């Protein structure tokens, strides 16, 4: 283990002891906000410090066994002990490296998931519906809550555009690598000759702002229009101007919400989505600056980048960023995304470790 890493772990051990003292003080426990903040920090540091204690124990075991090598009768035993202790140190050291990786501040946030049909017309809209079902099934498996924010349905089913809010533990950390272009290859239901067509959708995963105030939005920068909500094919579904369109003039970002009969609720939803889109835009601008110095395969989230192909005739999914191919498309489309997400997270961690190594 590098000296710099050991020094950092010693500091965290000291900090955990400080937190134990602070959390036992009456002036801290009576201040709910401060108590929550310190409790969260304690929960994050605990596993790291525990791992470090095991690493130090393994190092002590190796040192003790080293002293036994001089005794011929104990040499074989000592060599076995040293080997086992070093293996534990190596394993724990690798785990500690990952634990110390910079944490994405958005990882614990709820998200807005936006799917837009792209090239391919009706087939693209149908695939957008299939992607939505895939993510909703994954949300069910994780016991996340889902709320429909906005939907523009196509005439033959599916969606031209759909936005849902997904709330639950680690929603952003698990789905943040889904942003980008998703391509499908299959025989459309409308195809009479049995030919395989290619179409595409784009997915955007945006962390929800904790409060709308977290993203600075000047009311003077907003244009808010109301209109009658309409369903698929353009038919009006109610007779009041309950649908809301919010335009953020400085960025040109437009959000429409019409799924609720209440204009107030639609406006509230639209403002939440707008805040998330502005935050997402700011985040991407920051990432673009960082990308000038370090190219990331996984985390760019570029909407125009084709990240994945779903080949239905072959039952194959390919993630082009990490050259991963899985022949279990039916299960994946039914929401079984764990293997895919684990591979993306692992690659992202490897990139972070490599960048830290370069920095050293």
Swiss-Prot record:
Annotated Gene Ontology cellular components are: cytoplasm
Protein biosynthesis is among the record's keywords: yes
Q: Which PROSITE patterns match?
A: RF_PROK_I
* Alphabetical keyword list: Cytoplasm, Methylation, Protein biosynthesis
The record's similarity note reads:
Belongs to the prokaryotic/mitochondrial release factor family.
Quote the protein name from its UniProt record. Peptide chain release factor 1
Give the protein's function.
Peptide chain release factor 1 directs the termination of translation in response to the peptide chain termination codons UAG and UAA.
Q: Where, per the database record, does this protein carry N5-methylglutamine?
A: 235
Skewed-composition ranges (Basic and acidic residues): 280-293
Q: Which InterPro entries match?
A: PCRF, Pep_chain_release_fac_I, Pep_chain_release_fac_I_sf, Prokaryotic/Mito_RF, RF-1
MF terms from GO for this chain are: translation release factor activity, codon specific
Q: Which organism is it from?
A: Paraburkholderia phytofirmans (strain DSM 17436 / LMG 22146 / PsJN) (Burkholderia phytofirmans)
Which residues lie within the region annotated Disordered? 280-300
Protein origin, superkingdom: Bacteria
Under Pfam families, the record lists:
PCRF (PF03462), RF-1 (PF00472)
């Amino acid at each position: 283990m590098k000296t710099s890493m050991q020094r950092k772990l010693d500091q965290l051990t000291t900090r955990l002891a400080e937190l134990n003292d602070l959390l036992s003080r009456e002036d801290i426990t009576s201040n709910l906000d401060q108590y929550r903040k310190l409790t969260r920090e304690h929960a994050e540091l605990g596993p790291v410090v525990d791992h470090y204690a095991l690493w130090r124990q393994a190092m002590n075991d190796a040192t003790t066994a080293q002293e036994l090598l001089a005794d011929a009768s104990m040499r074989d035993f000592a060599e076995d002990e040293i080997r086992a202790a070093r293996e534990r140190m190596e394993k724990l050291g690798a785990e500690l490296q990952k634990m110390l990786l910079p944490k994405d501040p958005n990882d614990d946030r709820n998200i807005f998931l936006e799917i837009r049909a792209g090239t391919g017309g009706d087939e693209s809209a149908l695939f957008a519906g299939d992607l939505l079902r895939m993510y909703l099934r994954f949300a069910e498996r994780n016991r996340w809550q889902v709320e429909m924010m906005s939907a523009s349905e196509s005439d033959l089913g599916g969606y031209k555009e759909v936005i849902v809010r997904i709330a639950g533990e680690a929603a952003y950390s698990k789905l943040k690598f889904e942003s980008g272009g998703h391509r499908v290859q299959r025989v459309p239901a409308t195809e009479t000759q049995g030919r395989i067509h290619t179409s595409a959708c784009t997915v955007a995963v945006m962390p929800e702002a904790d409060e709308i105030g977290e993203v600075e939005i000047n009311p003077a920068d907003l244009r808010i229009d109301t209109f009658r909500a309409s369903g698929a094919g353009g038919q009006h579904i109610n007779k009041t101007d309950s649908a809301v369109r919010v335009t953020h003039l400085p960025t040109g970002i437009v959000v429409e919400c019409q799924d609720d009969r209440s204009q107030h609720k639609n406006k509230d939803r639209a403002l939440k989505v707008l805040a998330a889109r502005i935050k997402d835009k700011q985040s991407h601008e920051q990432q673009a600056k960082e990308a000038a110095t370090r190219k990331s395969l996984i985390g760019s989230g570029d909407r125009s980048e084709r990240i994945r192909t779903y080949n239905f005739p072959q039952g194959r999914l390919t993630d082009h960023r990490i050259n991963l191919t899985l022949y279990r498309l039916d299960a994946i489309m039914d929401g079984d995304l764990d293997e895919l997400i684990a591979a993306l997270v692992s690659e992202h961690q490897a990139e972070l470790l490599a960048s830290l190594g370069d920095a050293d």
